[in-house]
Structures are given as C-alpha cells and as structure tokens.
A protein has these predicted regions:
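PEST-like, low-complexity acidic/proline-rich intrinsically disordered segments
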Residues: 1-10
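N-terminal activation segment of mature serine protease catalytic domains
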Residues: 11-62, 72, 118-119
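Serine endopeptidase catalytic core focused on the charge-relay Asp
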Residues: 40-54, 68-69, 73-184, 202-204, ...
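Catalytic nucleophile loop of clan PA
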Residues: 58, 176, 190-213
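Short, solvent-exposed loop/turn segments that connect beta-strands within catalytic domains
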Residues: 63-69, 181, 202-207, 218-219, ...
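Short beta->alpha transition motifs characteristic of CBS
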Residues: 75-78, 161-165, 193, 210-218
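C-terminal cap/linker of serine protease catalytic domains
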Residues: 208, 212-237
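Negatively charged
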Residues: 238-858
C-alpha cells in the first residue's frame, strides 16, 4: 500500500507513474548480501493486513529508557491512528504466510505520528511472536548518515512481504539524498504497491536507515523516513500546544507549563520548546515555565514541548496556562502517578488531542484534572486505564461547555474513594452513563452532580454501590432538568451528611426509594429537598433522624408538596436548627409535629413562613423553645391561620422576632403571647405587621430593654383595639420607631408615657392613618433630639384632638412633610419652643392645620 495524499502534497501512489519507471522486482543481486538478507527477512519483515489492502512492516530492537524492546515499525498510513484507537480489535500481520494478531487492549507502548508518517508498536510476550521473529538490531549512537554516505556504497534496498502466497521481495536502487536536519530522504529503489512500511537498508553493511513511505512527484523519486528521526521522536516525549496571542496581551514571558516539587528535577535541564522547528528560550519563574519570544503579530502559534526524560508527576503541568489546544498523542505518561490539576484553569482550552492514547495505568490521583476547562466541549476517555486511581474529586468541575464524555461508562473506578464534585457545574451535560461504575470504595459523593442544570438522565444511578459513602451533601443539587430518580438501591447506612441532597431538583416529581434510605448515621439534612418544586408527596416514615442536628431549609420552597408521611415520627431530639424548615411550602394545609422534640433547637427563624394554605400545626402548643435564639419571621405569611396556641413557648433567650407574625392576616388570637418574656430581645421589626384580624395583644411581660428596632411593629393591624403593656415598654435602646402604629385604624387610645425615645432617629409614619386614635398619652414627654425624620408622623390621625409637641426638639429633623396632614379634628396644637431646622418646614407643617385648631406657638 503506497501513501495516498491529495494533489497538493508531494506524495502519491499513482502506480501509472511508477510503471513508467519500468520497475523490476527480484533482480539478481547475488554479488551483494541479498541472499543473506532474504533469509533474515523471512523473520524480520511482515505483511500488514488491512481491510482495504495491505502494506509492509518490519521488526527492530530499539533502546528505550535504557531497556531493549522489540517493536513493529511501519507507516502511519498503513497502521493508522483510527486503527489503533479500536482497542477491541487486533492488528493482523502475516509472517511466512502465517497470520498473527497483535491485540490493542493490552498495555503496551505505541508511538504514531501522521506528520512523520510512522507507527511503532511494542511486541510483548503475550503476542507469542518473540520466538518467531528475528528483529533488525541498530546502534542508535552511531547515526550520522549525512557524513558516512561519502564513505559507503550508496546502494540501497527496500524489503517487503506482499500479496497472497508471495515470498520476500527486494527492491534495490540508490540512496540519493540524506540530511541529518530533515525527516525524509530520496531513493530510487524499485517499489510497487505494498512496499509502504518496508525497511530501507544500505547494502554495503546491511544497515537500516529508514522506512519507505511514498513517492515524490517533483523529483520522481521515492521517499524514505529517516530512521534516526523516528528514534529521536520516540526518545523525546513531545507535546504540541497551541497558544493564542492577542493584541492586548503582553507578548513576552508567556506561561506554557508548570512544575511541582515532585517533578522539578525531572524537568530541569530536560525540556526544550520549539516554534516553527526553532528552539525558543525558556524561562523558569518559580513553579512556572515561560517562553520569551517577540511575537510579531497576533494569532495562533503552535509550540512543541519536548521532554527528554520521563515525568512521573504531571500534577498542575498546564494549570492556568493560556493554551487553546494541546496534542498529547506522543507524550509518554507510562510512569505518571499523579495527574491532579493537570489542566486546571485552562479556560481557553478547546481541544485535547491524543487524550485517548495517553497511558494512565499507573495514575493514582486525577483530582481536579480538568477543573475550569470552561471551553472544552468533548472529552474522549475511552482508553483511560483508571484501575489504580483513588481520587476523582472535581475531575470535570465547572467544565460548563462540556457536552459529551466518551468512554465514561468504561472507566475502572474500583479503587476510587473520592468523587466529590466530580461533575459539578457541567451545565451542558444532558446524559451520563455510569452503568459500569464500581463505586464500592467511594466514601465521598458530595456535590457529585450538583449544578448539572441540563442533566436529564444518569444511567446506572439505580445500581451504583454506595455502601461505603459517608458524604452525599448536594449530590444532585440543582439538577434542574432531572425528572426521574431512583435511589432504591442506595445503601446509605454510613452516610452522615445529606444536606442539599436533592436541593433544586425542580422537575423531579418523585424520588423512587426515598422511603428506603437508611439515615441512622445522618447528622445533617439541611436543604435536603429544598426547592423540589414539583414533588407532591414524600414518604419519610422510615427515616431515622436520631442523630440529625440540622434540618433547616429541609422542605423549603417545596411549593407543590401536599403531604409528608411520617413527619410525626421524626426524632428531632438532637436538632438545633429548624430555620426555614417548611418555608414556602405553599400547598401544605396540615402538619403533625406532635412528637417533635425541640428542646435543643436554637433557630426557628422562617420555619413556617409563606405556608399560605397552612391551617393547622398539630403539636405547636407543646414546643419546647427554651433554647431558641431566633424566631424571625417564624409564621410570616401564614395567612390561613385563625388561631395560634404558643402557650408553651419559652422566649427567654430569643433575640430576634422581626416579622414573626407578619401577614398572619386571619389570626384573631395568639394564645400565650402574654407569657413572652423575651429578656434578650433585640429586634421586633414588623413583628405583627399586617395581622389585620388581630383585635387584642397582651405584651405586658415583654422585656424590650435591649430592642433597637420597633419599626412597623404593629403596622396594618387594622382591627387592633388594645395593646396591653404598651405603657410599660422599655424603649431606651430603640433607634427606629418608623411606622410602628401605622394603619392601626381601630386603636382609640395609646399610653406611651414610659417611652424613652432619647436614641430614636426615625419617627416617620409612626401614627400614620390611625384613623380612630383620639389620644396619645405621654407624647409631650418624647425626647426627639436625635430624630432626623418625622415625615407623616401623625398623618390622617383624623380623630386626634390634642397634641402637645412643645417639648419636641426638632433641631436635627430634615423632613417634617405631611407630619400633621389631614389631622382634621385637632382642637389644640402646642408648638411652643418648636424650632424647625428650616423655617420652610415649620410653615409647611402648620399649613395643613384646621382654622378651628387652637395653635400655641409662643
């Protein structure tokens, strides 16, 4: 088989041209070494069988890393990269009309290069060829053909074994041109179809100098590949990379690879970089290797990195390097044990060629290998040998353009113990086949598929072995396109963390097998089902939560959830956090928490907030809240409650009650509120806001000495007629009273005689639209020296008849607008000593006063 190229290239297998040269095979050359050579060639040369023809090959001993190995040599166009990639197939050769098979699924060294046009396959004992073949032997140190040809007979010969039942064929001629700096040389040895891949030797000393590869049209001569160049290629571990130089980028000191503590001695003095076959200056800067080159213009440049010594550790080798493509086809990684961080942060990398050829048989660590390769769309791991790998954490993390990982289903993961964040943020993956994953040793699956937003199917997830897994935190978090999930076979007996496990699986309608999960060792269930917004039913009847300490956000935003079976059986004796546990469960109507032990709970903030349809919480009246610190927005927007019995609530340690009952607009009574002591209370902002059906509040036991914010505390309590204990409230630390009683349109009387307002800076809207308010006792004692805003403070207090503001210090007030707007019933207004910061403010203030009002100014 001759080399086939298009008409623009120098090679051809146009046999009509060769026939014009009157090729004569098997001429009598008995005066030289042809007889001896023919006998040797019976065991040294073979036919390479192809589906579409045949070519030649030969066996040769070469020295590789101080070891002698036997190899089969031929052309790359005879044994192609495509043929080599089919590991389940064999390379077939014929020796003395006997067919032999070379298996590709066995670990062996293989080199191939389409530019140099050669393929070299190591022959090993399992091939059963070593006792049959008689390889050529070479001395790699004596090659200097360019000069030696002057001293030798330049007669050469090409040997082949071709065709059905044919013997060894010899094609002889002259070696015309050899130069040490070039890959190819010219010869006119007689050849026909099938000679490609045959050895070229000097007849004078039976010396191997090359491989026949084709025909040059221009000179009408045959071409040989200089064997010295092939040996150099094999000896040098070459990586090809492409970098892109942009106009706004510094064109000097460009980082192209890195070293680490384990490989710096292997790299030192053993690496060279070439651009257009010219050596480029290398600069070592700590762990970074850079090139110093004056690029004349922007564009893409291909560099060759040549390692003259094997590297055992490629950890971080190209981390954060400005590479757009890389070719590892000829990089020998047979001794590498660590590939962690190898391409981490290569965010311009679009292509990794030859990844399916690298030897990973000794690799132990692949953690973070492709992390943040955010421009990669495809990876071929078909022939990755991961049998020794124990770490795959963050392997593909944030490869957010990655659409396909070929060969994933064939990875040997039998020794892997860490898969944390393995596919996290692979937001373009739609399908994963893990059907052959052996996860029997895996301990960590935390965040394994998290943020795979387009993932629709994980084949094999129902059969993976999780018997040793300890961490499942966020394993399926934000898999927003998963519709089905079967965890029936999950063995979770050792798992201690299930936080965020199914969080934001927004299309998931059912989690098959959830009732079978063994949770006996789980301590964290935070956000476990958060925003599973399509799930209507959960069966937790077999959940053992005796060790769980955090169930905050557990069902948060499950807005279609109608029933949670087994909730009343959950053991919460060790739980300390229930923050937002049922928040936004807007379809739940009933909760049975009668067996909840809340004695250790510290946080109940937002626990039932926005449960819009919730009508009853059985057992809420038995809650032990003696250790609770936070009740912020606990019942916010529970606007279907009519009654709340909190008679068992101990609030002595609670510091935050902001929004606690906000928008509970059907609640008429909060039983037990009178017992609230709240000795540590700091915030009551909007605590009862929009409790629009509440008629009575007894806050006589409230200790508000530490409270700083009471703004909107009773805002929009339209039906509120009495606030018992308001006259005893300690407001000495309050800074904000904005809107505190706003729209309390049924309040007729307020006794604020004990209010200490010395630290208050905002009183805007404080009594705004208290439509029935007739008297505010103690208003004349207010200390307002720090207040800056009194906007609309008494606006539309339409029943207010007397106001004494003579002690008001408004020297710092910036806004008095609408302060007394529409106070239509005012009979007397005392503004004596009322000195506004701006006269215009005072003018505007009294402009709205009725003519019937007795105005005291001096």
């Amino acid at each position: 088989m001759e080399h086939q190229e298009n008409e623009n290239n120098q090679f051809t297998n146009d046999f009509s041209i060769q026939k014009e040269r009157k090729v004569k095979l098997g001429e009598n050359i008995s005066n030289d070494n042809s007889l001896l050579l023919s006998q040797k060639a019976n065991k040294s040369v073979c036919e390479v069988i192809r589906k579409d023809g045949y070519g030649s090959g030969f066996f040769c001993k070469v020295i590789f890393e101080n070891n002698e190995i036997n190899c089969l040599f031929t052309n790359n166009h005879v044994i192609t990269e495509e043929m080599l990639s089919k590991k389940d197939e064999n390379i077939e050769i014929k020796i003395n009309n006997q067919i032999y098979k070379i298996a590709l699924n066995i670990n062996r060294r293989i080199w191939t290069d389409s530019e140099l046009d050669f393929t070299c396959i190591e022959i090993i004992e399992k091939d059963n060829l070593l006792s049959i073949i008689d390889p050529f032997e070479i001395d790699k140190n004596s090659y200097n053909i360019e000069f030696e040809l002057e001293n030798y007979d330049r007669k050469g010969i090409v040997i082949t074994s071709i065709g059905q039942n044919k013997n060894i064929e010899l094609g002889y001629g002259a070696i015309l041109y050899v130069k040490n700096t070039e890959d190819r040389f010219l010869h006119d040895c007689n050849t026909v179809e099938g000679f490609s891949g045959g050895p070229i030797l000097l007849m004078s000393n039976i010396r191997l100098i090359g491989i026949h590869c084709g025909y040059e049209k221009e000179n009408k001569k045959n071409l040989g590949i200089y064997f010295k160049k092939i040996l150099e290629y094999i000896e040098k571990k070459t990586i090809k990379i492409s970098i892109e130089i942009e106009s706004n980028e510094k064109k000097e000191d460009i980082r192209i690879f890195n070293q680490n503590e384990d490989n710096k001695e292997e790299i030192k003095d053993n690496v060279k970089v070439y651009l257009n076959n010219k050596k480029v200056k290398l600069i070592n800067n700590g762990d970074q290797w850079k090139i110093n080159y004056d690029f004349k213009k922007d564009g893409i440049y291909e560099l060759k990195i040549v390692f003259t010594r094997n590297i055992s550790n490629t950890s971080g080798l190209f981390e954060k390097c400005n590479i757009i493509s890389i070719d590892l086809s000829n990089f020998d990684t047979s001794k590498v044990n660590n590939m962690g961080y190898m391409f981490n942060g290569c965010n311009k990398l679009k292509e990794i060629k030859g990844l399916n050829k690298i030897n990973t048989s000794n690799v132990i660590d692949m953690g973070v290998m492709f992390q943040n390769c955010s421009n990669l769309e495809y990876l071929d791991l078909t022939y990755f040998d991961t049998s020794k790998v124990n770490n795959m954490e963050y392997l593909f993390f944030s490869c957010n353009k990655l659409k396909k990982i070929k060969g994933l289903n064939k990875l040997n993961t039998s020794n892997v113990n860490n898969m944390n964040s393995m596919f996290q943020k692979c937001s373009n993956l739609e399908y994963l086949d893990l059907s052959n994953f052996d996860t029997s040793k895996v301990k960590d699956m935390g965040l394994m598929f998290s943020y795979c937003n387009n993932l629709k199917e994980i084949e094999g997830i129902n059969i993976i072995n999780t018997s040793n897994v300890i961490n499942m935190n966020g394993i399926f978090q934000q898999c927003t396109n998963l519709e089905d999930l079967d965890v029936s076979n999950f063995d979770t007996s050792k798992v201690n963390d299930m936080g965020y496990m199914f969080s934001r699986c927004e299309k998931l309608k059912e989690i098959k097998g959830i009732n079978k999960l063994n949770t006996s060792n789980v301590t964290i269930m935070k956000s476990m089902f958060q925003k599973c917004s399509n799930i209507e039913y959960l069966d937790l009847s077999n959940f053992d939560t005796s060790k769980v300490n955090d169930i905050s956000f557990m069902f948060n935003c499950c807005d279609k959830l109608k029933k949670i079976k087994g909730l009343n059986k959950l053991n919460t004796s060790n739980v300390n956090n229930m923050n937002s546990m049922f928040q936004n469960c807007s379809n739940l109507e009933y909760l049975d928490l009668s067996n909840f032990d809340t004695s250790k709970v510290k946080d109940m903030g937002l626990m039932f907030s926005y449960c819009n349809k919730l009508k009853e919480i059985e057992g809420i009246n038995k809650f032990n809240t003696s250790n609770v610190l936070n009740m912020k927005a606990m019942f916010q927007h529970c606007n279907n409650f009519e009654n709340l019995d909190l008679s068992s609530f101990d609030t002595s340690k609670v510091s935050d009650m902001d929004f606690m009952f906000n928008d509970c607009n059907k609640v008429r009574e909060i039983k037990g509120i009178s017992q609230f002591k709240a000795n540590e209370l700091v915030n009551t902002y909007s605590m009862f806001q929009d409790c629009s059906s509440l008629e009575y509040l007894d806050l006589s036991n409230f200790n508000t000495s530490k409270v700083t914010n009471m703004s909107n505390m009773f805002n929009e309590c339209y039906e509120l007629k009495e606030i018992k204990g308001i006259n005893k409230m300690n407001t000495s630390n309050v800074t904000n009273l904005r809107g505190m009683f706003q729209k309390c349109s049924n309040l007729e009387y307020l006794d604020l005689s004990n209010f200490d307002t010395s630290k208050v800076n905002d009183m805007a809207f404080m009594f705004n639209k208290c439509l029935k308010l007739k008297e505010i006792k103690g208003i004349q004692k207010f200390k307002t020296s720090n207040v800056v805003n009194m906007k609309a403070m008494f606006q539309e207090c339409k029943k207010l008849e007397y106001l004494d503001l003579s002690k008001f210090d408004i020297s710092k007030v910036d806004d008095l607008s609408f302060m007394l707007y529409s106070c239509k019933s005012l009979k007397e207004l005392n503004l004596k000593n009322f000195k506004a910061k701006k006269d215009s403010n005072k003018v505007n203030l009294i402009a709205f006063i009725s003519d019937k009002c007795h105005l005291i100014l001096e």
